[in-house]
């Protein structure tokens, strides 16, 4: 990935598309506590459309936002997607209930939730798919290995990680 210090600049994903340095994080378009639908779905849809109309070409979401609500709203608002729009999603958190987050980065879980994200987003391939967190019960090589398999199958373009540090 390359970038400059200019906030209007772009980032180029390795070997892939160029996106605006400022994107839209879609976590908060779900309901309170990132659970369930928003109180005003039409407002959330209008926000997504306005962002794209204003030049945003990168939207970041996750299967756990809602759960599933954020991805569903993105598709309802923007499908068929405009040329150049990059949608990133994540897998590795589950939502047992409102206000509750649990980690699950087992390969079989990641494969399942990526498939569900593809369906909700109405995509054949997610351009950037990220491991949402590290699951200390699962060797990271197994979690990343599952994403590599999904990439080889053409279901994801690029692999990323979220909620990690250099330590």
Predicted segment positions?
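Glycine/proline-rich, positively charged
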Residues: 97-167
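A short acidic, helix-capping loop that chelates divalent metal ions and anchors anionic groups
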Residues: 30-34, 94-101
């Amino acid at each position: 990935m390359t970038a400059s210090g200019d906030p209007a600049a772009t980032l180029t994903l390795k070997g892939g598309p160029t996106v605006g340095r400022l994107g839209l994080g879609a976590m908060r378009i779900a309901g309170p506590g990132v659970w369930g639908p928003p109180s005003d779905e039409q407002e959330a849809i209008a926000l997504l459309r306005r962002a794209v109309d204003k030049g945003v070409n990168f939207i970041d979401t996750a299967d756990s936002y809602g759960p599933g609500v954020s991805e569903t709203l993105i598709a309802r608002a923007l499908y068929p997607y405009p040329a150049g729009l990059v949608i990133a999603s994540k897998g590795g958190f589950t939502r047992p209930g409102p206000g509750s987050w649990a980690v699950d980065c087992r390969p079989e879980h990641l494969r399942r939730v990526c498939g569900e994200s593809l369906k909700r987003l109405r995509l054949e391939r997610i351009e950037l798919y990220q491991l949402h967190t590290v699951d200390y019960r699962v060797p990271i090589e197994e979690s990343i290995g599952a994403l590599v398999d999904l990439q080889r199958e053409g279901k994801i373009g690029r692999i990323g990680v979220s909620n990690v540090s250099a330590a």
